[in-house]
Amino acid sequence: MAIINMSELDLQGKRVLIREDLNVPVSEGVVTSDARLRAALPSIKLALEKGAAVMVMSHLGRPTEGEFNSEFSLQPVVDYLTKALSCPVRLAKDYLDGVEANVGEVVVFENVRFNVGEKKNDEALAKKLAALCDVYVMDAFGTAHRAQASTHGVGLHAPIACAGPLLAGELEALGKAMDNPARPLVAIVGGSKVSTKLTVLESLSKIVDQLVVGGGIANTFIAAAGHEVGKSLYEADLIDEAKRLAANAQSRGGDIPVPTDVVVAGEFSPTAAATLKGVSQVSADEMIFDIGPDSSEALAEILKNAGTIVWNGPVGVFEFDQFGEGTKRIAAAIADSSAFSIAGGGDTLAAVDKYGIADKVSYISTGGGAFLEFLEGKELPAVAMLESRGK
């Protein structure tokens, strides 16, 4: 990839505009989860160290374009950054017609989604943003799959467009996992529906040595194998699709293993009583919420021998502890594996946090939709823009 990296540039005295993903949960004016902010700090600090006048922009939530709404203000993010950075940080509400930015300070632009034309990648808006800087830095992998004014258009018109350390790190890790992986390459895809992950499953089934499915997705594969799934969440209209994917895997010398034992309950609730059953013994009034110990041990063995592991989605309803043992065992197996491992997606990161394996996963992706689209083999608009500007 012919992408310019921010780390390679002389930024002394330059006006540097960094697009970060600072879309964090806020409650009563306080940031309640700072993972994305912590991920963005190294890039902001590097620009400061290089002597730049630093401007930062991001979206937060889904406000109505053209309307200021304090609920979606980046003020809580500015408050956080003020404590995290040893320099002045201020919020600029009106910046499109010019903003004063000095070397050694950070100016955070108010929510880019307050600007009319942001989501539609309006060219006039993109040009206004580009006119504010000498160097545009795209560092928000979490929004790299969206062609919007602040993630794509601005980069086409800025004097220089480059990737920040976070984005560059994401692309390097994903490239290592998908483009030239140490084999065997094992992918775990969980989640509730086959339909939302169908293109991911399709794409991965052609390149991985072993595809593992979990969650509601696995229920559809269990049904496709001819087993009763009771009242479990599954997609009857995609059973043929599941059979085809399984056949594809077998034609490549692999398979998509169906659980041999499952954990069921009669209701979906935090207090539901969990019962362990063989996969062929699920009754009509039961729901499958996790894989059983035999199945999780079999998967752990697969992971033990992997060269590369890509994890997207839990294998059970791990939010309830009685249905979390499968995901917990998978997490432990990934932590113990010598394979290069990459985890991505909101539920996956929640599981990584819950089971305390963050420092044992080789790379944790900050992208949700962007992570999935990369796995699907789709071109990410922001990355394509950076490649075009790097030539």
UniProtKB/Swiss-Prot annotation:
Q: Where in the cell is it found?
A: Cytoplasm
Q: Does the keyword Cytoplasm apply?
A: yes
Sites binding substrate sit at 21-23, 36, 59-62, 113, 146
Q: Which biological process, per GO, is one annotated for this protein?
A: glycolytic process
EC numbers, comma separated: 2.7.2.3
The answer to keyword Kinase applying to this record is: yes
Q: What's any one GO cellular component for it?
A: cytosol
Its pathway, per UniProt, is:
Carbohydrate degradation; glycolysis; pyruvate from D-glyceraldehyde 3-phosphate: step 2/5
The catalytic activity, as recorded, is:
(2R)-3-phosphoglycerate + ATP = (2R)-3-phospho-glyceroyl phosphate + ADP
Query: What's the family?
Result: Belongs to the phosphoglycerate kinase family.
- PANTHER family reported for this sequence: PHOSPHOGLYCERATE KINASE (PTHR11406), PHOSPHOGLYCERATE KINASE 1, CHLOROPLASTIC-RELATED (PTHR11406:SF23)
Assembly and interaction partners: Monomer.
Name the chain's protein: Phosphoglycerate kinase
Gene name in the database record: pgk
